[in-house]
């Protein structure tokens, strides 16, 4: 019997240190789950809590669905009524969760790299809990990135040589940062478009910024990003924002849709602002993978959670 190539990780907080073969193994495992493959049987209970300090519907529900499909026991956590509001640190909250018997915590937080304090412990610290990053500020969004990779691989069967345009508010997007890094590592060619005020020179190492209409006919993937209004506090460009003008200049309308390559796809991490990033009646079009991305998210998050279960030898897995 062929030995399965399964990933084992102590935490899943970033795609930065993932090896290419680990990415491919996670995609393969997620595809296995999607086809109805059996989950590994847990020999002891595993307790997980979802700590979302920023609003979320898709990611939160997707993680909980993945957890339940794996047979984990999900313990509710309400940030609005947590002791964080009394000044408790995230580390101390995690310490409490750990003491109560929680094995894993899935966290979304507004602070970039919040997880560093939870996984890089000082000599006197004893926290022993697995951390899965569901998004840190404008830093990383590893689970969205991984489900994006799964969706691209499912459609094209490979990454090498694919041309991918990331369009929109790139500076404030954690999805963009995770995706550009991993796509480049996997051999895809990355391009950027969108308002230059929301583009940073630090992205030049991954690809170049071009006018949208010049990019569209040669791209395999159009990855659209919403404008992150909630992260624009004090940004003078926010006051000048006009949804109609943005759609005219940077959105995918019917004319641009028709200019795309026959086999090209549109992706969006959601939520979609209709008639801003994408014409509303194109959300469920043949090229748009938005619904498939959400579907794939459950199975990829199952693969990611399972990798941490194995890495921490929880539930009898290793």
Curated annotation (Swiss-Prot):
Keywords: Pyrimidine biosynthesis, Transferase
Residues where carbamoyl phosphate binds: 58-59, 108, 141, 144, 270-271
InterPro entries named among the record's database cross-references: Asp/Orn_carbamoyltranf_P-bd (IPR006132), Asp/Orn_carbamoylTrfase (IPR006130), Asp/Orn_carbamoylTrfase_sf (IPR036901), Asp_carbamoyltransf (IPR002082), Asp_carbamoyltransf_Asp/Orn-bd (IPR006131)
This protein's GO CC annotations: cytosol
TM helices/strands, residue ranges: none
Catalytic reactions on record: carbamoyl phosphate + L-aspartate = N-carbamoyl-L-aspartate + phosphate + H(+)
Family statement: Belongs to the aspartate/ornithine carbamoyltransferase superfamily. ATCase family.
Job description of the protein: Catalyzes the condensation of carbamoyl phosphate and aspartate to form carbamoyl aspartate and inorganic phosphate, the committed step in the de novo pyrimidine nucleotide biosynthesis pathway.
HAMAP family in alphabetical order: Asp_carb_tr
Subunit structure: Heterododecamer (2C3:3R2) of six catalytic PyrB chains organized as two trimers (C3), and six regulatory PyrI chains organized as three dimers (R2).
Name of protein: Aspartate carbamoyltransferase catalytic subunit
């Amino acid at each position: 019997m062929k030995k399965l190539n399964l990933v084992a990780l102590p935490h899943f907080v970033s795609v930065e240190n993932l090896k290419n073969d680990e990415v491919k193994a996670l995609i393969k495992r997620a595809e296995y789950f999607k086809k109805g493959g059996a989950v590994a049987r847990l020999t002891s209970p595993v307790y997980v809590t979802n700590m979302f300090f920023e609003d979320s519907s898709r990611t939160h529900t997707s993680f909980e669905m993945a957890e339940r499909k794996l047979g984990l026991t999900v313990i509710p956590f309400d940030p609005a009524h947590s002791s964080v509001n009394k000044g408790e640190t995230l580390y101390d909250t995690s310490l409490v969760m750990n003491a109560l018997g929680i094995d894993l915590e899935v966290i979304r937080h507004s602070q970039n790299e919040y997880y560093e304090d939870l996984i890089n412990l000082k000599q006197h610290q004893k926290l022993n809990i697995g951390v899965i990053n569901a998004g840190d500020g404008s830093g990383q969004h590893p689970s969205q990135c991984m489900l994006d990779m799964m969706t691209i691989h499912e459609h094209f069967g490979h990454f090498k040589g694919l041309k991918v345009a990331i369009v929109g508010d790139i500076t404030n997007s954690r999805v963009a940062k995770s995706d550009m890094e991993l796509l480049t590592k996997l051999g895809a060619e990355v391009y950027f478009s969108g308002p230059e005020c929301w583009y940073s020179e630090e992205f030049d190492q991954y690809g170049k910024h071009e006018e949208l209409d010049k990019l569209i006919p040669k791209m395999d993937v159009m990855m659209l990003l919403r404008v992150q209004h909630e992260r624009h506090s004090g940004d003078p460009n926010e006051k000048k924002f006009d949804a109609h003008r943005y759609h005219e200049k940077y959105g995918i309308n019917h004319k641009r849709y028709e200019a795309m390559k026959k086999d090209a796809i549109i992706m969006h991490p959601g939520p979609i602002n209709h008639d801003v990033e994408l014409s509303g009646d194109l959300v469920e079009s043949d090229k748009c993978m938005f619904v498939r991305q959400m579907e794939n998210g459950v199975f990829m998050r199952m693969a990611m959670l399972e990798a941490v279960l194995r890495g921490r030898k929880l539930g009898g897995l290793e």
